């Protein structure tokens, strides 16, 4: 085998290994939780989500009303059956209790992104439920 041919195979092998590395995942920090006395069985949660560069979410739903406010960077959000939207710091997004969140990712592969989510949900329900497509 010639050296250029070996080099090509080595490059291909390296690319295949990189493709097998999973994307970065989001970091979630709970900031606040409270029972909503005026709404029996409901609670409010406030979480901060940090996307490292290149991070993306799994397809999921919240079974909650979710109000998103972007603090830093740019993110792409898409609900099933709707177009994707790109949001930057200061912009907002809403997910309803029956929405399936098919895309949630950091636009940048070099800069982090952060956002706050206010969730109004049934008490004891998980904050996030993965959905199989």
Please describe what each predicted stretch is.
Residues 2-12, 16-45, 78, 93-94, ...:
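A short, N-terminal "cap"/entry segment at the start of jelly-roll beta-barrel domains
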Residues 34-65:
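N-terminal targeting signals for Sec/Tat export/insertion, comprising classic cleavable signal peptides
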Residues 62-81, 91:
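Glycine- and acidic-residue-biased ligand/ion/polar-headgroup-sensing regions
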Residues 41, 61, 69, 86, ...:
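Extracellular/periplasmic catalytic domains that process cell-envelope and extracellular macromolecules
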Residues 45-47, 73, 114:
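Envelope-exposed proteins and targeting segments
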Residues 56-58, 76, 93, 97-106:
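Histidine-centered metal-chelating micro-motifs
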Residues 36-41, 51, 81-98:
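Short acidic-glycine-tyrosine-enriched beta hairpin
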Residues 84, 99-125:
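Ligand-binding loop in jelly-roll beta-barrel domains
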């Amino acid at each position: 085998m010639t050296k250029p041919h070996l080099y090509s195979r080595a490059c291909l092998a390296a690319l295949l290994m990189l493709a097998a590395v999973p994307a970065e995942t989001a970091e979630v920090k709970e900031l606040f939780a409270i029972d909503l006395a005026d709404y029996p069985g409901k609670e409010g949660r406030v979480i901060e989500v940090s996307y490292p560069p290149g991070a993306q979410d799994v397809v999921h739903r919240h079974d909650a009303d979710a109000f998103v406010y972007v603090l830093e960077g740019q993110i792409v959000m898409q609900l099933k059956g709707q177009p994707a939207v790109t949001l930057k710091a200061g912009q907002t997004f809403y997910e309803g209790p029956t929405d399936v969140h098919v895309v949630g990712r950091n636009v940048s592969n070099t800069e982090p992104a952060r956002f706050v989510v206010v969730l109004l949900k049934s008490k004891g329900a998980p904050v996030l439920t993965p959905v199989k497509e």
